[in-house]
Amino acid sequence: PRNQILHRRPLPPVGGAGLFGMAEGAVYLPPAALYPAARLAFSSAQHRIGATVVVMRHFDAEEALRIIEAQKVTTSQWVPTHFKRLLSLPEAVRKRYDVSSLRVAVHAAAPCPIAVKQAMIEWWGDAIQEYYAGTEGGGTLIRAQEWLTHKGSVGRHWSGGRVFILDEDGKPIDEPNREGAVYFEAPPDPKAR
């Protein structure tokens, strides 16, 4: 109807949105272009549930910190290269900005060097989370405190399923630091998927 304002609640979150701090009223920063699938999907999901999405035209480490402080960013998504560039800023610059509004700073897309992740946890604390996932579905999640006791891990299946690492013959790999193919098994309860 004309000249009527319809008030609607945001659509409910999809999938594991709650795992990554997605909620109505959140302020989400994807600190680079939206063409990678994960950043676009996270941005769309955040917008869909009523969050504010603040998009940077290109990544600039100090500008990202300025935006976090100015916009009171609560959730964000990073790659290890972003972390390296943030950490390469002079300490005085890093301390200039208040990033205490961050509740979730999730990272993925490439292995994060242990020293880099350790430094980010020391700086941003429990906000740091990492996920590992495949385009086909399934994934793992690890939060800062668990990672500190399992450095180098990408966590456990995010919805209670199982993760298998298999060698080229399809046999399970039990020892650490061996390459293999990663397989996800969905949890038995469809509500957990």
Range-by-range predicted roles:
Residues 19-23, 97-98, 155-157, 174-176:
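Solvent-exposed alpha-helices and their adjacent loops that cap or buttress functional pockets
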Residues 26-27, 103, 181:
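Residues that mark the start of a beta-strand
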Residues 2-18, 28, 65-67, 83-90, ...:
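Adenylate-forming
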Residues 59-60, 81, 111:
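Short beta->alpha linker loops
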Residues 175-191:
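AMP-binding/adenylate-forming core of the ANL superfamily
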Residues 30-31, 55-56, 106-108, 166-168, ...:
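Thr-Gly-centered strand-to-loop micro-motif
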Residues 2-75, 89:
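Conserved AMP-binding/adenylation subdomain of ANL enzymes
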Residues 48-51, 73-78, 87-151, 158, ...:
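Gly/Ser/Thr-rich phosphate-binding loop
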